[in-house]
């Protein structure tokens, strides 16, 4: 974890030795202000959360690209966001995307749940025609090709994220 260590010491020579390390976020020489340490910890947490969010979203989009989803479609963006929201919620079993997670995505993008659902279905239809049969069979472990439902796509990608 680069830039995630805060050093507090009364020994100036020790602080000088570690100051340029990639792992040091900030150094404090005693006496110090606790408010500054608290602010530094909050900044580290925010930066790490942002990096984790960016990494997860990148992995989701990578999986969608494998399936030949077209990112010019709004539905692809909504599907990606829906998968991210489920991942973030730590829900292991989602019964109804339309009732549980589409409203979250709809609120974020200021759209109706029906618009989110329709755009996701449109993106899936386009993906189904753009993606090779072989890729669909391998990815979804199908013996024959059928158009996947949104929930199937969500679960498969979540399983890949959880490893």
Residue ranges and their predicted role:
Residues 14-15, 36:
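Short gly/pro/ser/thr-enriched loop/turn and capping motifs at secondary-structure boundaries
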């Amino acid at each position: 974890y680069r830039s995630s260590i805060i050093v507090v010491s009364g020994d100036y020579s020790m602080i000088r030795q570690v100051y340029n390390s990639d792992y040091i976020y900030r150094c404090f020489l005693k006496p110090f202000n606790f408010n500054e340490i608290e602010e530094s910890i909050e900044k580290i947490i925010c930066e790490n959360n942002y990096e984790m969010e960016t990494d997860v979203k990148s992995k989701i989009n990578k999986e969608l690209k494998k399936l030949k989803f077209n990112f010019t479609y709004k539905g692809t963006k909504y599907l990606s966001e829906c998968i991210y929201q489920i991942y973030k919620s730590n829900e292991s079993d989602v019964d109804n995307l339309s009732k549980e997670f589409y409203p979250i995505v709809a609120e974020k993008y200021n759209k109706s749940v029906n618009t989110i659902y329709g755009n996701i279905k449109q993106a899936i239809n386009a993906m189904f025609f753009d993606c090779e049969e072989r890729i669909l069979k391998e990815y979804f472990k199908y013996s024959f090709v059928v158009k996947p439902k949104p929930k199937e796509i969500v679960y498969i990608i979540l399983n890949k994220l959880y490893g």
